[in-house]
């Protein structure tokens, strides 16, 4: 079975690639590698999430990038919202090492990047203003829904959970789960089969 990116220590041979990408009118330099998600470019789903994300107004707290990979979402949002601290977590150590290097390469200092299998290493009692995730679809529906449902406990009141999922990979199911957990859900936009879905903790 081919190893997927929801793996603590990928065994696939390292084949790093570096490229430049524009996100939210800013230029970024990213290095990615085999054994991490979307190693050749910033994937369309992440780009759509980055471009459509809005920080909730009047909510105090950091932002969490759950399943950050090599860091395009967290790093670009850290550049967009320099007054915010962005915490970026992943289960994949190779991805985390790349995320740290990419933050440094782009001179981003308002980030904390650390290992966590889903919310395992998140500070107990911490409440975020927003959680964003391009979830690890290949890890299976149970993992994806765990990420979405447990987000509720880590959000401040009026904080938001925003995710991107393709329709064919379970967006309608994710929408239903978020409605069930939060009592509200909005499909912010749909583009090329990708849905941006948002819920608010009320």
Language-model segments: residues:
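Conserved SAM/SAH cofactor-binding pocket of Class I
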Residues: 45-133
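Class I S-adenosylmethionine-dependent transferase superfamily signal
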Residues: 77, 151, 178
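Glycine-rich phosphate-binding "P-loop"
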Residues: 132-142
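A short glycine-rich, Lys/Arg-flanked "PGG" loop and its adjoining helix->strand segment in the class I
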Residues: 145-157
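Conserved beta-strand signature within the Rossmann-like core of class I S-adenosyl-L-methionine
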Residues: 158-165
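Conserved class I S-adenosyl-L-methionine
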Residues: 166-183
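Core SAM-dependent methyltransferase catalytic element
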Residues: 183, 190-202
């Amino acid at each position: 079975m081919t190893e997927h990116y929801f793996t603590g220590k990928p065994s696939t041979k390292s084949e790093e690639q570096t490229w430049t990408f524009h996100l939210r009118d800013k230029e970024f330099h990213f290095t990615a590698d085999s054994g991490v998600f979307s190693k050749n470019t910033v994937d369309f789903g992440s780009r759509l999430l980055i471009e459509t994300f809005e920080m909730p107004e009047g909510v105090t707290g950091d932002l969490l990038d759950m399943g950050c990979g090599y860091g395009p979402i967290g790093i670009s949002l850290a550049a967009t919202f320099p007054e915010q601290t962005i915490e970026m977590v992943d289960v994949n150590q190779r991805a985390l090492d790349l995320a740290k290097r990419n933050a440094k390469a782009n001179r981003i200092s308002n980030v904390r990047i650390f290992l966590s299998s889903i919310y395992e290493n998140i500070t107990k009692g911490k409440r975020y203003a927003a959680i964003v995730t391009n979830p690890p679809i290949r890890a299976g529906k149970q993992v994806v829904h765990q990420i979405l449902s447990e987000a509720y406990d880590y959000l401040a009141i009026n904080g938001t959970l925003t995710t991107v999922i393709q329709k064919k990979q379970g967006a309608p199911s994710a929408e239903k789960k978020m409605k069930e957990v939060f009592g509200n859900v909005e499909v912010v936009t749909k583009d090329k089969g990708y849905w941006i879905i948002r819920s608010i903790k009320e």
